[in-house]
């Protein structure tokens, strides 16, 4: 299948633009994220990518090209960062594939209305890239209810989430990917669920640690002991239309870096100019690959290749951003002192954040192993 926009997509694009212009009337604060999700829900813009089996759960059905149009226009409008995307793009498709009818009816409409927010409980201090090393447990108590005990880390949006989908070990003594289950845990359990923000080197706290101390979990998706299958199915969803949205953001960042180079005169350096041109060309290539994959033309290793390209590209852009500014890119404002914190500028924030691009979501080393072992058929890495 080749990916190509349809003639009818022009009308849909205009509808999206008009709606966004009418509703993006004031800046959306972090506290307003929930309100914006509900606004999106009322507009019918949540769940566009859910498959046809989701009909009747409150979402609007859209073609693949319409999903891309929505994602592109949302990014171009500089609309607020989503706080409901984990439920919409990860949990909902997982429930459609593995959930019971009762689970779909309970959770999908609330996600489509923008009323319930989710976070993901996968990584642990000793199980990040090696997800099969999960130690969090879920055991039945005296009443037969499952209680979750353990720690998750790097959990985005945990402070705002109503629910967390958790990969936990339900078979005592099980090893690796055996004996795991996929559980849905309510976050509002004082004394049983604790969220601690993680301060990053950029000064922000986008990630959290989550501690479960006998937290109740009555919902299990995909059957007991089948958590690995469900978890891997969910991870495959983390690549797709959202990649195109990310690339539009990358293009805006690249434009700002180029403007800085022009304004400062750094663009007269032929080596730096060549690096900027290469960034532009590689971004165009990534977009083509993303559209090709969405059209069904990518091979089994396409998601891993895309992750490698994206992480390296963004990291190099961050390095360029501070290099272009020269010494000013490495120091704070004139009134900085060792005892007074200062706000990082845009280039510094970009540089510091992009150091993580080759790590989160599966490190470069993991992606190369996947390509080598699962696509090229090379021997497994010795352990």
How would you describe each model-predicted region?
Residues 136-139:
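A structural signal for short hydrophobic beta-strand segments in well-ordered beta-sheet cores
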Residues 2, 65-69, 90, 227-228, ...:
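Glycine-rich phosphate/cofactor-binding loops in nucleotide/flavin-utilizing enzymes
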Residues 1-85, 106, 110-113, 270, ...:
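Amphipathic, small/basic residue-rich leader segments at the start of a protein or domain
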Residues 42-105, 109, 113-114, 157-163, ...:
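Internal helix-loop-helix
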Residues 127, 153-158, 201-202, 356-361:
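Glycine-rich phosphate/pyrophosphate-binding beta-alpha loops
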Residues 3, 193-286, 357:
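Glycine-rich beta->alpha junctions and the first turn(s) of the following alpha-helix
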Residues 114-122:
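A short, Trp-centered hydrophobic/proline-enriched beta-strand micro-motif
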Residues 145, 149-194:
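A short core secondary-structure module
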């Amino acid at each position: 299948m080749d990916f190509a926009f349809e003639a009818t997509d022009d009308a849909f694009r205009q509808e999206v633009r008009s709606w966004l212009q009418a509703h993006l009337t004031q800046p959306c604060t972090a506290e307003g994220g929930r309100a914006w999700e509900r606004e999106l829900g009322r507009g019918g813009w949540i769940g566009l990518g859910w498959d046809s089996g989701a009909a009747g759960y409150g979402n609007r059905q859209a073609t693949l090209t319409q999903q891309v149009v929505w994602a592109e226009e949302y990014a171009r409008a500089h609309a607020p960062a989503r706080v409901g995307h984990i439920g919409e793009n990860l949990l909902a498709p997982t429930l459609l594939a593995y959930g019971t009818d009762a689970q779909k009816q309970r959770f999908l409409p609330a996600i489509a209305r923008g009323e319930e927010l989710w976070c993901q409980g996968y990584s642990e201090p000793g199980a990040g890239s090696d997800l099969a090393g999960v130690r969090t447990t879920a055991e039945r108590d005296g009443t037969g209810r499952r209680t979750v005990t353990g720690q998750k880390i790097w959990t985005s949006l945990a402070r705002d989430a109503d629910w967390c989908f958790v990969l936990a070990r339900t078979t005592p003594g099980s090893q690796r990917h055996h004996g795991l289950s996929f559980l849905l845990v309510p976050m509002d359990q004082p004394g049983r669920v604790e969220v601690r923000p993680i301060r990053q080197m950029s000064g922000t706290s986008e990630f959290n640690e989550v501690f479960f101390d006998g937290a109740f979990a009555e919902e299990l998706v995909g059957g007991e002991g089948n958590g690995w299958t469900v978890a891997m199915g969910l991870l495959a969803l983390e690549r797709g239309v959202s990649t195109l949205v990310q690339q539009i953001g990358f293009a805006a960042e690249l434009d700002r870096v180029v403007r800085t180079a022009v304004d400062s005169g750094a663009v007269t350096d032929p080596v730096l100019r060549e690096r900027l041109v290469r960034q532009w060309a590689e971004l165009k290539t990534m977009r083509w690959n993303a559209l090709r994959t969405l059209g069904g033309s990518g091979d089994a290793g396409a998601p891993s290749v895309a992750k490698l390209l994206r992480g390296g590209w963004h990291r190099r852009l961050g390095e360029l951003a501070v290099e272009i500014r020269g010494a000013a890119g490495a120091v704070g404002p004139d009134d900085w002192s060792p005892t007074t914190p200062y706000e990082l500028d845009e280039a510094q924030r970009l540089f510091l954040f992009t150091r993580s691009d080759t790590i989160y979501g599966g490190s470069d080393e993991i992606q190369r192993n996947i390509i080598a072992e699962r696509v090229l058929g090379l021997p497994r890495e010795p352990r």
